[in-house]
Amino acid sequence: VLGWDPAFRTGCKLAVVDPTGKVLDTVIIYPTAPQKRVEDAKKLLRDLIAKYNVYLISLGNGTASRESEQVIVELLKEIPQKVRYVIVNEAGASVYSASKLATEEFPTFDVGQRSAVSIARRLQDPLSELVKIDPKSIGVGQYQHDMNQKHLGESLEGVVEDCVNKVGVDLNTASASLLEYISGINKALAKNIVAYREEHGAFTNRKQLLKVAKLGPKAFEQCAGFMRISGGENPLDATSVHPETYQAATELLEKLGFSSQDLKRGGLAGIGRKIRDYKAMAKELGIGEITLRDLVSELEKPARDPRDEMPVSYTHLRAHETLSDV
């Protein structure tokens, strides 16, 4: 993904990140006024797209966004690669890029480069980036400054914590800041998880968490159920089913004529109707009835996420469109 932080005088900052959010390259181009070096910008963009197999451009919606968008639309008509672009809300990105956290994460980057990285990562995993920003900086209502700031901060932090643990995190894209909110994970462990991922590549199963420095069985027991791995070795790793319940889940699926591989199709809708007696089935599996009902609910719709029901908040033009067509 290529993140694009648009600007006029100071130039547009670009950052390319891999699927896990690791920064691969950063450059500055000047396609907008006053310099308008459009062709130079296009050449740099072509090189980046070809070198890193960029398939998606994440464009911030701030100053010079429309002018930058026009350059992207023209470029996409000229290149053979199939690249799409999305306009991303960059609220709070400037606050993050100038923060102590951003300085620790990217000590050699300037503010603009950090902002471009944040914009790219917001498209991959919005929650992972938004937790790095003080919730008050995003704008939570016109009367937020009239409230007791301490109470407001505590309430907003509580909402973020509940949200993160309710929907879980993608273990292969989550930032250290996001991982800190997970039960059993502190700041040091969060950094160790990210460091392990950057050194060894993407996680393929939850058990690999036990190889992370200082992450022992107790921490694993607390955090594993909130960690998701999409496309991993075990389809159950992409659900909220805890590893302790994997054996029961596998036995249940076998009794009902399925396997964990069937979950890859997006869940087993209606599987609960095949269980005539929950109490008896729970006893057979050696788990509680409430646990069984939770297990069935998750197998019917793995990684249930309330955000899926929200309207899409971004817009993008197709490559052949221009602003005059809209």
Language model features with spans:
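Residues that form generic nucleotide/phosphate-binding pockets
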Residues: 48, 126, 155, 159-163, ...
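Accessory alpha-helical DNA-binding modules that contact the DNA backbone or grooves
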Residues: 166-300
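Conserved small/polar residues in nucleotide/adenosyl-binding loops
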Residues: 315-322
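Edge strands and adjacent loops of beta-rich recognition modules
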Residues: 306-314
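Phosphate- and other anionic-substrate recognition elements at nucleic-acid/protein interfaces
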Residues: 1-4, 9-157
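Short, contiguous strand/loop micro-motifs
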Residues: 31-32, 59, 106-107, 162-166, ...
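Charge-patterned, long linear interaction tracts outside catalytic cores
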Residues: 125-196
